Swiss-Prot record:
Cofactor(s) needed for function: pyridoxal 5'-phosphate
Residues the record lists as N6-(pyridoxal phosphate)lysine modifications: K239
E.C. number: 2.6.1.14
A GO BP entry: biosynthetic process
Matching Pfam families: Aminotran_1_2
Gene3D superfamilies attached to this UniProt entry: Aspartate Aminotransferase, domain 1 (3.90.1150.10), Type I PLP-dependent aspartate aminotransferase-like (Major domain) (3.40.640.10)
Name of this chain's protein: Asparagine--oxo-acid transaminase
Length: 393
């Protein structure tokens, strides 16, 4: 008899973390590795945010538990943030804070999914959605988007996938891994469809502040009151404020669902690290100048690297509008190098050149790879040179 649960045996390892682990192993062996696999900014957390955490340690506030669902002061900061960037305010009972947006997503699925409930996920999708749904006995239902439609789902596709078991749809705009952004018109159509059929909307807004070249991010929760009431917003401070190591995520939405998520937090992790909560308060309502500095740096990298990547033999890439990833189709590149599997292709690239990319298979796109441009320009240019040489070899 196996010692492990069915749930764990059916679970896949995160492809992004697995790729990063292999890259770190090669680095430890002395290899020259260029890691473009992890989705984290290369900037140090801004000093004002660091100081807020250190102050809470020095004055003793960080020494103790807080309310499991988050400091009241942090919930108030999130409400202020929503007033400023979303245009509406939320009450404390509509907010739960937890150990990273990834865990908050898990808590949401645990709070609303019953066995065999279906959750519609447009592909490509962020790697953890599907496994978290399955871990909670739900059924992920994938709808394949097209490059021609900029990797965005349509109401017609959603309706074709809908059954009497459909509980929720997942929207991630700007998208990881594609960088696409839904327009207000597209979101309105999807939101009205969800309201009509009483389907919950999970809106993963983690990259909402990172948009480029005049693109605009519209949160679906701002479209109308009925759509807002149907939506649970997932967000955090990791990407916008370069705080991936602080593990601060939160959800905003229906008080009943948020209350259920708060119960799950109280029985699993308890409160988020107290010092990190004080840091998050400063991030959300403190000086925002560094956000624009980082956004401009990402935009410069995007605009510099995109034409170089587009020239790599066998790589076909759509220019992203947000987040910090390229997601090229490498079907021709695989054919040119004699590979039929994208994971074999990325493995060979890593072993031969030291460039770590993420296979698209884990994102539901077996002909694509993901490259993060959340690293310095020198590294990015050298990585493209190595990929070019690999393809021309």
């Amino acid at each position: 008899m196996t010692k492990l649960s069915r749930r764990v045996l059916e679970m896949e390892e995160s492809v992004t973390l697995a790729t990063s682990a292999r890259a770190k192993t090669l680095k430890a062996q002395g290899r020259d590795v260029l890691e473009l696999s992890l989705g984290q900014p290369d900037f140090v957390t801004p000093k004002n945010i660091q100081e807020a955490a250190m102050k809470s340690i020095r004055d003793g506030r960080a020494s103790f538990y807080t309310i499991a669902s988050g400091l009241p002061e942090l919930k108030d900061a999130i409400s202020q943030y929503f007033e400023k960037f979303y245009g509406y305010s939320v009450e404390r009972k509509q907010i739960v804070v937890g150990t990273g947006a990834k865990f908050i997503l898990y808590a949401l699925f645990a709070a609303v999914i019953n066995p065999k409930d279906e959750v519609i996920i447009p592909t490509p999708f962020w790697v953890s959605y599907a496994d978290q749904i399955k871990m909670n006995d739900g059924v992920p239902v994938f709808i394949r988007t097209s490059e021609e439609n900029h990797f965005k789902a349509t109401v017609e596709q959603l309706e074709a996938a809908r059954t009497n078991k459909t509980k929720m749809i997942v929207l991630n705009s700007p998208s990881n891994p594609t960088g696409m952004i839904y327009s207000k018109k597209e979101l309105e159509a999807i939101g009205n469809w969800a309201v009509k059929h009483d389907i919950l909307i999970l809106s993963d807004d983690i990259y909402g502040r990172l948009v480029y070249n005049g693109a605009r991010f519209t949160p679906i929760s701002t479209i109308s009151q009925p759509i807002c009431q149907q939506t649970i917003v997932i967000n955090g401070v990791s990407k916008t404020y370069s705080m991936t190591g602080w593990r601060v995520g939160y959800a905003v939405g229906d008080p009943e669902i948020i209350g259920a998520m708060s119960k799950i937090v109280s029985q699993t992790t308890s409160n988020l690290t107290t010092a990190a909560q004080y840091a998050a308060i400063e991030a959300l309502i403190g000086n925002q100048d560094t956000v624009e500095v980082m956004r401009q740096a990402f935009e410069e990298r995007l605009n510099t690297i995109y034409p170089l990547l587009a020239k790599v033999p066998g790589f076909h890439v759509v220019k992203p509008e947000g987040a910090f990833y390229f997601f090229p189709n490498v079907k021709k590149a695989m054919e040119m190098k004699g590979y039929t599997d994208v994971t074999e292709f990325t493995t060979a690239l890593l072993e031969e050149t030291g460039v770590a990319l993420v296979t698209g298979a884990g994102f539901g796109a077996p002909e694509n790879v993901r490259l993060s441009y959340a690293t310095d320009m020198v590294t990015l240019k050298e990585a493209i040179n190595r990929i070019q040489a690999f393809m021309e070899k």
